[in-house]
Amino acid sequence: AARRGGRKKIAGLCCAVDKKRFHAVLGGPFGQGNKDCLEYVLSVAEQLGFRTVNLDGYCGYAEIGEGKELVGIVGHLDVVPEGDGWKYPPYSGALEEGAIWGRGTIDDKGPAIISLYAIKALMDDGFKFNKRVRVIFGCNEETGSLCMKHYLEVEEPISYGVSPDSEFPVIFAEKTINSVEIKGESTDGKGAKLVSLDGGIVINAVPDICTLTVNANGENPADVAQKICDALSKNNIEHEYAVHGDEIRFTVHGKAAHGSVPQLGVNAISYAVAALDGVVNNDFVRIYNAYISTCVHGEKLGCFAEDEYGKIAVNVGLCHYENGKFSIKINSRLPFSTDTKTMFNGIKSTLKNEVCAKVVLLSESEGFKIDPDSDMIQVLYNAYREVTGDVESKPVCTPGGTYAREFNNCVAFGPEMKGYGEMIIHQPNERLTLEAMKAIFEIYVKAYADLIDKVSFDSKK
């Protein structure tokens, strides 16, 4: 029954989250959409035979089994904004072309509900739960993980567990993540003037659209527009513009990607500002192009670093300019060879002579590393290999961040995997193929059984 029912429930979950998710409501601190989604998932879990608890709308869980140790499977129901360019409506859960389409089908509603049904499959098979198993559903992973902070304030921590919110075969390390803002007040020089600029929806995604308005300020508007168009076209950047008197309004298009891998996207903000070089003479444009530009590894910003797991990832996720005031918000993923203090000081040192700019640390989430030869990593790794036959893929260090960093003895495990086409997250047309869903389900059934049976930790936090 569990194996037959999962597809419809994943589609239902995609429909349950709507655009109201950011507005807090009674019983739902993260918005009506997240509140509805959490209540829906818990009602499904209760019907499946789980004990369920709603923790004040911050998160909830479905539990089965008895015992001292508590095994956690920690997923999230919140999603990043849907953006434009979808083939099918992003909250329809449309079953088309052999896939379920919708925001969150892969990140992370789909894997969360697949995990619930994997445990249900073990229940139906008569598996002996000699430990408590708790499938936890958070509602604020994408914008701060306040849900898990609340969980840890009111509930016991898990003894060990996984977060189905990354990739296979298994994640043994997550890099430190931080967010920095460069803000200030810009002075204009002669020539065309930047009136406003807006780009990005969330800080942890590569922005695929940026809008800006330029005033010709005595120059020929058509000439100003042509210069900007030429610069954008030179970099193969799609754009549209309209001239309204002395003002030229541009919409610049990039390619969305997860903020942890900015090299896979095309940052609409960075290319929009680059196109203003030589057209608009002000501090904001000069500073952006001199120290950030289209670089994604902090080469010009004074924070470049790398180690055996790769280079630092530096993503401008949000940018706003109006009335001379500017804000550039940057999300970064750090190699283990550096830390937030070193990075922050490097940026401050680089910008020390820019008196109009101030650097502010907005947030930090420290990474972690677990021995890839540890029992837990090897149990998960071997379960993946046994089900898939993939003996080439190795445990991974990821620039992404998951709930795993909120707990001790917790790692990310799936769902992204080789052999099932492109698994798109944080972009239009996110979808989970039925073939991939079946494979993920079978991996989780095997891995969760082994995780419960073959791994043990002291339950102290």
Language model features with spans:
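Zn-dependent metallopeptidase/amidohydrolase metal-coordination segment
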Residues: A2, E322, D375-K454
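A short beta-alpha structural unit
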Residues: C59, I292-V296, N315-H320, K329-F336, ...
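Redox- and metal-dependent alpha/beta enzyme cores, enriched for Fe-S-associated oxidoreductases
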Residues: T340-C356
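Active-site metal-coordination/substrate-binding segment of hydrolases
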Residues: L70-F137, T143, E155, Q427-A439
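Buried hydrophobic packing segments
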Residues: V41, A112-L122, Y151, A272-L276, ...
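Midchain, well-structured core segments that form catalytic/ion-binding scaffolds
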Residues: E142, M148-P335
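Acidic/His- and Gly-rich active-site-bordering loop/insert found
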Residues: A1-R103, F127-F129
